[in-house]
């Protein structure tokens, strides 16, 4: 289960839960922790790709006029 469902305060920004999970995935990945690389370098290598896509889809759904009726994806 995603961590943003656990008792956390909502910061009021769109897709904030996915943003937190994406950030946590990058910062806890072996690429950053053990190898000492920057998170941006790990993204280029393809780590946490599913979280990146989910966050992108959530942000993109904010621009979709149909989502006003359906709600944002990922929330």
From Swiss-Prot:
A GO term from the CC aspect: mitochondrion
Cysteine pairs bridged by disulfides in the record: 31-58, 42-48
Keyword Magnesium: no
Annotated CHCH domain residues: 28-66
Keyword terms of this UniProt record: Disulfide bond
Motif Cx9C motif per record, residues: 48-58
Extent of motif Cx10C motif: 31-42
GO BP terms in the entry: mitochondrial cytochrome c oxidase assembly
Matches recorded under PANTHER family: CYTOCHROME C OXIDASE ASSEMBLY FACTOR 5 (PTHR28627:SF1)
Role: Involved in an early step of the mitochondrial complex IV assembly process.
Family, similarity comment: Belongs to the PET191 family.
This protein's name: Cytochrome c oxidase assembly factor 5
Gene: coa5
């Amino acid at each position: 289960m995603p961590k943003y469902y656990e008792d956390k305060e909502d910061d009021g920004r769109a897709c904030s839960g996915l943003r937190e999970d994406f950030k946590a995935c990058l910062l806890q990945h072996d690429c950053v922790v053990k190898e000492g690389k920057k998170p941006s370098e790990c993204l280029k290598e393809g780590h946490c790709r599913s979280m990146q896509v989910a966050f992108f889809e959530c942000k993109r759904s904010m621009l979709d006029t149909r989502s006003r009726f359906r709600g944002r994806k990922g929330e």
